[in-house]
Swiss-Prot record:
PROSITE patterns in the record: AA_TRNA_LIGASE_II (PS50862)
Protein name: Phenylalanine--tRNA ligase alpha subunit
Subcellular localization: Cytoplasm
Catalysis performed (reactions): tRNA(Phe) + L-phenylalanine + ATP = L-phenylalanyl-tRNA(Phe) + AMP + diphosphate + H(+)
Main location: cytoplasm
Protein species of origin: Oleidesulfovibrio alaskensis (strain ATCC BAA-1058 / DSM 17464 / G20) (Desulfovibrio alaskensis)
Gene that produces this protein: pheS
Annotated Mg(2+) binding sites: E253
One biological process term in Gene Ontology: phenylalanyl-tRNA aminoacylation
InterPro entries xrefs: aa-tRNA-synth_II (IPR006195), aa-tRNA-synth_II/BPL/LPL (IPR045864), Phe-tRNA-synth_IIc_asu (IPR004529), Phe-tRNA_ligase_II_N (IPR004188), Phe_tRNA_ligase_alpha1_bac (IPR022911), Phenylalanyl-tRNA_Synthase (IPR002319), tRNA-bd_arm (IPR010978)
Keyword Mitochondrion: no
Needed co-factor(s): Mg(2+)
Positions in coiled-coil regions: none
SUPFAM superfamilies for this protein: Class II aaRS and biotin synthetases (SSF55681), tRNA-binding arm (SSF46589)
Summary of subunit composition and partner proteins: Tetramer of two alpha and two beta subunits.
Length: 346
């Protein structure tokens, strides 16, 4: 038998083998046997140097044609086997069965509480204002009655970009910016991120704060108390008790700290099992925000006449409200992106 005959016999031999190949594994064995580096086609072509020079072109041409035919046979059989395997899989699939629903994401708990607070104040007639997180020294300090060398600046570890440019330490600069742009009456809240050099269980370098203020004729401390009491009872529950304690802030006079009855122990200082409350440290009260009547010096910096207008301002940390509302003990959990933690608020 000549080499040409041997080459041409490979095609029917492979066709018979493919008819018996019932799996992709068997098909691969046949491919190696016929087309592998040591397969039958390679063995025949290894004898090509034995031929006379004039015979080699004919054998080479035949070998190329046979190789193409073998590849075509393999491809067709492989396609057929893959279709059979897919059909077998589909035969076990019931399209009427319900699918698996993907997990639905949700807003971050801090965002949820911030949105809730904004909705409460929108219901009280307040506008929502926003502004730059990179502030100048004037709007962050001086216009709020904190000139250079003022001791109140030591209360805040400030992150400076340049000598007079900084990352805002509170959202109070928006009080100044808004009052410069608007004439009384003005009522607005300013939610946003603020930055301070601090990091522990209850502090992070970046956190969220909401500044609120109202200016009009004859605004009094009673208006401030009524507004904040209404707000806190809407967020923490109508049975929440609220108390005001004298305090100091450079941009308000008089100033106060606001406490609410502890959410964890119901304001009793101890839990039902007699264990002392770790949140309020058995006092029954937890600090929630700072507030006061806007200082006349702040009015002067924005062009308001303090003899005609009065107003109040308050500020609160959104993370603190969220921690108290949901009983979260470590502030850093908000920023660790632990899905197990976040899913609890979905």
């Amino acid at each position: 038998m000549t080499l040409v005959n041997e080459l041409e016999s490979l095609v029917p031999d492979l066709a018979k083998g493919l008819d018996q190949a019932s799996s992709l594994e068997m098909l691969e064995e046949l491919r190696i046997d016929f087309l592998g580096r040591k397969g039958r086609l390679a063995q025949i072509m290894g004898r090509l140097p034995e031929l006379a020079p004039e015979e080699r072109p004919v054998v080479g041409k035949t070998a190329n044609a046979v190789k193409e035919s073998l590849n075509n046979l393999f491809d067709r059989r492989k396609t057929a086997l893959e279709e059979e395997r897919e059909a077998e899989k589909l035969s076990r699939f019931d399209p009427s069965m319900p699918g698996r629903m993907p997990r639905v994401g949700s807003l971050h708990p801090v965002t949820q509480v911030m949105d809730e607070i904004c909705q409460v104040f929108k219901g009280l007639g307040y506008d929502i204002v926003t502004g730059p997180e990179v502030e100048n020294d004037y709007h962050n300090f001086e216009a709020l009655n904190m000139p250079p060398e003022h001791p109140a600046r030591d209360m805040q570890d400030t992150l400076y970009v340049t000598e007079n440019i900084l990352l805002r330490t509170h959202t109070s600069p928006l009080q100044v910016r808004t009052m410069k742009e608007r004439k009384p009456p003005v009522a607005a809240i300013a939610p946003g991120k603020v930055y301070r050099r601090d990091s522990d269980l209850t502090h992070t370098p970046m956190f969220h704060q909401i500044e609120g203020f109202m200016v009009d004729r004859n605004v009094s401390m009673a208006d401030l108390r009524g507004t904040l009491t209404s707000f806190l009872q809407q967020v923490f529950g109508k049975d929440t008790r609220v108390r005001f304690r004298p305090s100091f802030f450079p941009f308000t006079e008089p100033s106060a700290e606001v406490d609410i009855s502890c959410c964890m122990c119901g304001g009793k200082g101890y839990h039902k099992d007699g264990a002392p409350c770790r949140v309020c440290k058995t006092t029954g009260w937890v600090e929630i925000l700072g507030c006061g009547m806007i200082d006349p010096e702040v009015f002067k910096s924005v062009g308001y006449d303090p003899e005609v207008y009065s107003g109040f301002a308050f500020g609160l940390g959104v993370e603190r409200v969220t921690m108290l509302k949901y009983g979260i003990g470590d502030l850093r959990m908000f920023f660790e992106n632990d899905v197990r933690f976040l899913r609890q608020f979905a």
